[in-house]
Regions:
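Flexible, glycine-rich loop/tail regions that form catalytic "lids" or insertion modules at the edges
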Residues: 1-187
């Protein structure tokens, strides 16, 4: 498992912002709620568990790369991996501030071109197989535009070219998403 001290270090990083950073009051409440989760050890939600997982990899000096239409905030306003200063629009990524010797955390809000973005991330995962590369589909049937990449590269690339990809697809709606084909990226 992950050492308790590492979890505390990650928890401190993801529940605070620099003193001179003007955080939106709603986000301040969320950061305080995260801090309370770490104090009590109770109520750890999905987004916090995700951040702990990413943070543990970063402390092991791995690169973590996440892209998708609304990844910085999170499709359901749950992640807040990048905070935005309400006065000057500067950004702050808590997961890049755990330890000076950590790996790099990259999180990109992409354009709504699933075919292009997922194709790029697939290529990135092949170029850097030691990185955790994730693509998050937006809520709704937005993985359908990427289905060719899923079928022709991700699902069959190892068989075709003997190249494995560790690309992770995060598909928030699962089978309950709205639309005519709510299965969101069947393999």
């Amino acid at each position: 498992g992950i050492p308790v001290e590492a979890l505390r270090k990650i928890g401190a990083a993801i529940s605070t912002a620099p003193a001179d950073f003007n955080v939106n009051p709603k986000i301040v409440r969320q950061l305080k709620a995260k801090a309370a989760m770490f104090e009590t050890g109770e109520g750890i939600d999905w987004a916090t568990g995700e951040a702990l997982g990413f943070g543990s990899l970063l402390l092991e000096k791995h690169r973590v790369r996440l892209s998708g239409e609304d990844c910085q905030r999170g499709t359901f306003s749950q992640r807040h991996a990048v905070l935005i200063d309400q006065v000057n629009q500067n950004t702050y990524a808590p997961l890049n501030n755990i330890d000076p010797a950590q790996g790099v955390f990259e999180v990109y809000n992409s354009l709504l071109s699933e075919f292009g973005v997922l194709g790029f991330e697939y290529g990135y995962s092949l170029a850097d197989p030691n990185a955790l590369v994730l693509w998050e589909g937006q809520f709704g049937d937005f993985a359908n535009g990427a289905q060719v990449i899923i079928d022709q590269f991700i699902a069959s690339g190892e068989t075709k070219w003997l190249r494995m990809s560790g690309l992770v697809l995060l598909l928030p709606p699962g089978y309950e998403g709205p639309g005519p084909e709510p299965s969101s990226a069947p393999l």
